[in-house]
């Protein structure tokens, strides 16, 4: 296996480009240390031609956001018959669409928060649901575009319908669940430990800065929860992973309100970050796996027709 040529796909042209470059560089470094022949590929418009010239044995997908985790790069890799890591075309497309992913997860017995999909221009000056609630782009990651509307706000934020909104017009309006931020990864069909995320006090919630700035958040893994809640998070993570058809690794995010006992699944990430501040490496460490172990497993798991 170590004589394989691996193309690490990174960068791209989504809002998460910088994160992808960090994830990709870290994964490429580890693969080179493990003895693989590695090509670092900053994905652009001509990626199909680039891959045809490189002829890699495996494509390691370290892309994040639209194009990288919504089924499009996966479709190109299927067409070129290049085995690749992470989820396939269908699961990637479904998981990227928060609305459709929630429907599938709920049908699999996963608890979700009440929500509705709307065009941002239709929100206007009337609350689309009783505050507090969250407005977020349907197909973005890393908390880009997330707005929390508090109980004391008389009208929805004006920027949702403004020209400064930098995302697609379709948004999800979802009931805000207060409480603890939890996440859980699935590796193949093995569910790993539950991790609690504690954003630094300077951040209102687990936003982009708290995710990627050094010291922006504290990861407690395994999370200190009752056995019932802990196992519920694991069960729902695996159920969502399987129902959506994910392959390789995924990570599901949750909110847990201790006052009411309400535990809800928020979304699933089919391309979890692999930066120095990312959650997956810490979750893997709690299960006795090193960063290199996870990357090695992904390479060995790579295939087409995922």
Swiss-Prot record:
Pathway: Cell wall biogenesis; peptidoglycan biosynthesis. It catalyses: 2 D-alanine + ATP = D-alanyl-D-alanine + ADP + phosphate + H(+). It is an enzyme of class 6 (ligase). One of its GO terms (molecular function) is ATP binding. GO terms for biological process: cell wall organization; peptidoglycan biosynthetic process; regulation of cell shape. Gene3D superfamilies: 3.40.50.20, ATP-grasp fold, A domain (3.30.1490.20), ATP-grasp fold, B domain (3.30.470.20). It is found in: Cytoplasm. The keyword Protease does not apply. Residues 102-300 form the ATP-grasp domain. Mg(2+) 1 binds at residues 253, 267. Binds 2 magnesium or manganese ions per subunit. NCBIfam families: D_ala_D_alaTIGR, PRK01372.1. Belongs to the D-alanine--D-alanine ligase family. Cell wall formation. This is D-alanine--D-alanine ligase. It comes from Bartonella tribocorum (strain CIP 105476 / IBS 506). The lineage of its organism: Bacteria, Pseudomonadati, Pseudomonadota, Alphaproteobacteria, Hyphomicrobiales.
